[in-house]
Amino acid sequence: MPKETPGVSLGIHESQSRIFENQIGRSRQFTRWLFKKMKSYFGEFGIRDEEEFYRLVNKVETGFIRTEADEVHYNLHIMLRFELEVEVIGKNLEVPDLPEAWNSKFKEYFDRDVEKSSDGVLQDVHWSIGAFGYFPTYTLGNLNAGCLFEKMQKDIPGLADGFEKGDVSLATTWLAENIHQHGSLYEPGDLIKKATGKDFTPEPFLNYLDEKFSDIYEI
């Protein structure tokens, strides 16, 4: 019997961390709680109030480092890496030429000049350990997270009220019931449809970004 491909993908795995990092961790409600907690430990630390803290956590600006990127720019960092991977795997780009190709593409996407490789092609561990093709799972994770969080909010009225108290138990319970308990039983698209009642689509994630940052920047 041939071994079947495992069902759930790394794009689903990444969606779980992205939900907690972004939709929950960068929410106005959770950052309000976090600001108070930090102030109780550190006293004054140069940030005026909860609203300023929230806006700083969600500040949109171009930067060199993927792991420090805001939610708006993050997927551009992934696209850059993915396009270079395609070129390398397709033997259209040699490894010694990667730094120059990276810097050129970064300039095109972010309009900034990379001055050192630690801010560019050498900033991630993935390629050095042979993890080619992993980067797209982060964007897939973002898109899956958008689908799941949209449904979570509809299923749990007042979900964000708990975040303001540092309580994420309603979110973890919903994910346990709708995602975790199924393990690798379903293919990603089937799992998303089972959890949300809808086919996978980028729309919930795009709507989330539009609503959130339109509010922050009053646009």
Protein language model features and the residues they cover:
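All-alpha helical catalytic cores of prenyl diphosphate-utilizing isoprenoid enzymes
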Residues: 41-63, 67-80, 85, 112-114
